[in-house]
A protein has these predicted regions:
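Substrate-binding cleft of extracellular glycoside hydrolase catalytic domains
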Residues: 30-52, 63-151, 155-158
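Short, aromatic/basic amphipathic alpha-helical patches
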Residues: 57-59, 82-86, 149, 175-181
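N-terminal secretory targeting signals
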Residues: 1-19
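Distinct, well-ordered alpha-helical segments
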Residues: 52, 143-147, 172-183
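Aromatic-lined carbohydrate-recognition surfaces of secreted/lumenal glycan-active proteins
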Residues: 157-173
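Functionally critical loop-and-helix segments that line ligand-binding/catalytic clefts
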Residues: 13-51, 56-59, 180-268
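Flexible, glycine-rich phosphate/dinucleotide-binding loops
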Residues: 103, 170, 239-241
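Residues at the C-termini of beta-strands that transition into short coil/loop
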Residues: 98, 165, 236
């Protein structure tokens, strides 16, 4: 791991501006023909359920084949190399999510967290350029300075910064990200946003297989962005509960992507 990291840093062009220019934002189309379905879960996709199929197969049975699978790099059931191989064998892209409960106030705290993310991403073999979405809980106090530090350092490490957050204007993320778009647009415009609001009532905790996803793309967007620029929208939570082989209740969340280049270029 250390050798690979040293090699990558040595061969990268010097200068933060040059490094930042290597991270690109997927082009946004005014009109799209379809919305692309995917899921995210805190449960491993290859977890065997009580009915002798995997969580991935349970998703397919109850919805449709997912274009991507969002998985956490941290936590009790975090993403493993074995699960990466499993999902890739299914032809499914992976959206990397990082969850951390440490304070998110200063630019230096953002730098330090990005370095932690980089080490873990390298251990898992996540390729350069892939997006890593930092999950921000709606109850967390997060600042523009922290996000600027996190995003700039993660780009320096070769990854695309993203945030999975409540984008409603009533919460801190929306306000602080919007401040960042005003003061440091060159950094913040390269961040991908995974909006977890609004969820659509009939999709939350759903158990029916008849509804797949809403027809219209309606995530909340921070000021400084348009809805079309939101990368991922989580429109339903905690769906299709079922116990796994160990007796633990599993669920998954429902997501849409409007821009296929987010999946092609920023997931792995």
């Amino acid at each position: 791991m250390a050798c690979r990291k040293t090699y990558r840093k040595r061969t990268m062009p010097a200068g933060a501006d040059v490094l930042r220019s290597m991270i690109t934002q997927p082009a946004v189309a005014d009109h799209v023909d379809r919305l692309l379905f995917g899921v995210d879960s805190k449960i491993q996709a290859d977890d065997l359920l009580q009915n002798n199929i995997t969580e991935f197969e349970w998703v397919v049975r109850n919805k449709i084949y997912p274009n991507f699978y969002g998985r956490y790099l941290t936590g009790e059931n975090c993403l493993t190399k074995s699960e990466i191989n499993f999902l890739h064998s299914k032809g499914c892209k992976i959206a990397a999510i990082y969850r951390d409960t440490e304070q998110k106030q200063t630019e230096e705290e953002g730098h330090l967290l990005a370095k932690k993310v980089d080490v873990l991403a390298l251990e898992l073999g996540i390729p350069d350029g892939a997006a890593i979405f930092l999950e921000i809980d709606e109850k967390e106090t997060v600042t523009r300075d922290f996000m600027r530090g996190f995003a700039s350092m993660l780009m320096t490490e070769g990854f695309t910064p993203g945030f999975k957050a409540n984008t409603d204007a009533k919460f801190a993320f929306d306000r602080e990200f919007s401040r960042g778009m005003q003061s440091d647009k060159d950094i913040f415009k390269l961040c991908l946003i995974w909006a977890v609001v609004p969820t659509v009532k009939e999709y939350n905790g759903m158990t029916t297989t008849h509804l797949i996803h809403p027809d219209n793309w309606m995530p909340y967007a921070p000021s400084g962005l348009t809805r079309k620029e939101i990368a991922v929208w989580q429109y339903g939570r905690d769906c299709h509960p079922i116990e796994d082989d160990a007796g633990n209740v599993t669920t998954f969340n429902l997501n849409l992507v409007r821009n296929e280049q987010v999946i092609i270029g920023k997931m792995f």
